[in-house]
Amino acid sequence: DRQCEYVRAIAFALLGEDESKAAAATLNQMVIENGCHLNTGFLSTPFLCDVLAKYGYADTAYKLLLQPDAPGWLYEVGKGATTVWETWTGIDENGKPHESLNHYSYGAICGWLFGGVCGIRYTDGALTIAPTPDKSLDWAKATYDSPAGRIVSGWRYNGDAVAYEFGIPANLTVDVTLPDGRKLTLAPGKHTV
């Protein structure tokens, strides 16, 4: 079994809901047993954290996001990266690159930063926001210049409390779902919750 097989089956809706829940539980366990490292490729990596978070494993998704060792996004940052590399270990021990140091593939995590961590989902003119804050990250904020205008979603921890900020463009209302179950409908403008 590989993580990618489970990610694709869930993300591409190839399973029923009960099967997806069971597959997500197995996927979560696989990631944990792999030291919270991913072993997915180009097709599955963009969906991994989203699938985990959707089925109640956001804590594991955050551990993947913040993994300091290879394979992991922060490994590159720890080595001085200012771009996303083509491979997880894009430089050798002497700092010499052996592949592209500016490559789109693993940058796919940005989709989850916008759509999961900050919760911005804008599809066919409809906007929903459902942020997924986690204490392992003190704060997050995303700004998306959509066809409807600028959308902002952010959150910040203050102790155990989370403060949210939202910016909604003109002529658009948005349904916001907070992790505690609160549902809000926000009109255009800036909002703090």
Explain the meaning of each model-derived region.
Residues V7-D18, F47-Y55, G115-G119:
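Well-ordered alpha-helical scaffold segments within catalytic/enzyme domains
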Residues D1-L43, K63, Q67-A70, L74, ...:
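Extended glycan-interaction surfaces of carbohydrate-active proteins
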Residues C4, L43, G56, Y104, ...:
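Conserved active-site and cofactor/substrate-binding residues in soluble primary-metabolism enzymes
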Residues N39-V51, V174:
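Amphipathic alpha-helical protein-interaction segments enriched in hydrophobic
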Residues D59-V193:
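Non-catalytic C-terminal accessory modules of carbohydrate-active enzymes
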